[in-house]
């Protein structure tokens, strides 16, 4: 079997282990991987298969390290996130190497998934763009509801920071999303409009 197809199967099998299920029975992690890959295809129409696989690894086995295992404050969140970047990147690299993917490609995926070189590495930037667009398109309302105790300004600051991480092309894509008015208002506020 082709190493890329073998890697895809191994990655998706890891996603299937996610105990969180959607109403249709699919794992939440597999659904997220599909959304990430779809955004990569939209943002980078000639994306190499290895970049598409990297997109599928964005939250690889994230479920295995619950946010609740770290302090609830900002420092705890940042520590958790940094740990996940490295863990997910290493797991992705291991699965790719087991599948026969060349070491150089597996190392690229490691860099992209671990967020190395954001703003300077096109692969890392593409994954960050896709992750933020998936968040805006699919997750922001549930995030707002889950954190109803946050003041509006905190959401605006989150959006401002996220916007600053987007490439110009991804910013344009974000502006084309059919977002709820409350989200659009917060984005406008974040952008000073």
Predicted features along the sequence, with ranges:
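Divalent metal-dependent phosphate-bond-processing catalytic cores, especially two-metal-ion Mg2+/Mn2+ enzymes
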Residues: 2, 16, 20-30, 34, ...
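Amphipathic alpha-helix face/heptad-repeat signature
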Residues: 7, 51, 81-85, 126-129
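Residue-level detector of well-ordered alpha-helical segments, enriched
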Residues: 32, 47-56, 88, 105-109
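N-terminal, Lys/Arg- and Ser/Thr-rich interaction peptides
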Residues: 2-13
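Helix-adjacent hinge/juxtasegments
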Residues: 68-111
């Amino acid at each position: 079997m082709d190493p890329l197809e073998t890697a895809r199967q191994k990655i998706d099998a890891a996603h299937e282990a996610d105990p969180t299920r959607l109403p249709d029975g699919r794992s939440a992690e597999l659904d997220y991987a599909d959304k990430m890959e779809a955004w990569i295809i939209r943002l980078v129409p000639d994306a190499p298969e290895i970049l598409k696989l990297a997109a599928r690894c964005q939250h690889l086995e994230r479920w295995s390290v619950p946010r609740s295992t770290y302090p609830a404050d900002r420092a705890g969140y940042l520590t958790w996130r940094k740990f996940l970047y490295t863990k997910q990147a290493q797991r992705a690299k291991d699965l790719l190497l087991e599948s026969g993917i060349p070491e150089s490609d597996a190392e690229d995926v490691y860099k992209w998934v671990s967020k190395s070189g954001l703003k300077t590495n096109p692969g890392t930037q593409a994954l960050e763009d896709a992750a933020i667009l998936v968040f805006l398109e699919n997750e922001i309302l549930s995030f707002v509801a889950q954190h109803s105790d946050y003041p509006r300004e905190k959401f605006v600051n989150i959006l401002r920071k996220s916007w600053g991480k987007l490439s110009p092309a991804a910013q344009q894509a974000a502006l084309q999303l059919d977002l709820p008015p409350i989200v659009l208002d917060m984005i406008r506020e974040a952008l000073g409009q």
